[in-house]
Amino acid sequence: MPKVAYSEAEKAQVREALLTKGLELLAKQGIQHTTVEQIYKAVGISRTFFYSFFPTKESLIIEALYLQQPRVLVYAQKLMDAPSLSWREAVTQFLCACCYGEKNGILILTIEEQQMLFRRLSHEAYRTFREKQIRLFGNILECFGIGADCARVGLFTNISLMAMIVRRAIPETMPLFVPEAADETVAFQIKAIVDFLEPLKKENFCR
């Protein structure tokens, strides 16, 4: 018999479980191939109970992305602290893990997924997401030992997302790109990003 009443603590645990399982499935399968049913069944609750936490699939996705942000930052710091890795190796490994997010439990939205998700967000929800995104990428830069002014954060955000999204887009969304060269393209972009960041780290260190 299904449980009728949940305490507030139990509800909080269920909500956390939905986000954790949702993030896991979304990162592995993508937004379009992950259903609400898969998530609530994995947690062991009903469809109705799921919607008492998240009124739409999109609202769960946004919350899952927010859950992911501090985890990504912890991962970046772990690489920075690894004595076996040089600065370049740590940054390269971090960016590579993000570009191949589905293999590393990191949710990266494709172009189509971004369009589908954000056209359904309110202006306020979109503004909040952008603020959190800017804060995340600024924190990542600071984790790398680089000063995070607005212009620098904006550029780092764009060039990082460009590498991640292009990798996900070949060949389905970008059919004119050569799929056999996709990995080499990602490696080239990551090296270019690291080459751009390294002098900024030295500049920040000398101040």
For each predicted feature, which ranges?
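C-terminal peripheral helix-coil segments that are non-catalytic and often amphipathic
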Residues: 1, 135-146, 162-207
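Basic, helix-initiating cap at the start of DNA-binding domains
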Residues: 1-29, 38
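An amphipathic alpha-helix adjacent to DNA-recognition modules
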Residues: 12-20, 32-33, 53-77, 92
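Hydrophobic/aromatic residues within well-ordered alpha-helical segments
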Residues: 14, 57, 64, 68, ...
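Helix-turn-helix
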Residues: 25-59, 63
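Hydrophobic alpha-helical connector segments
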Residues: 63, 77-104, 157
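Amphipathic alpha-helical packing segments from all-alpha helical-bundle domains
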Residues: 70-77, 119-147, 151-155, 180, ...
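Amphipathic alpha-helical segments used for helix-helix packing
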Residues: 89, 99-124, 138, 167-176
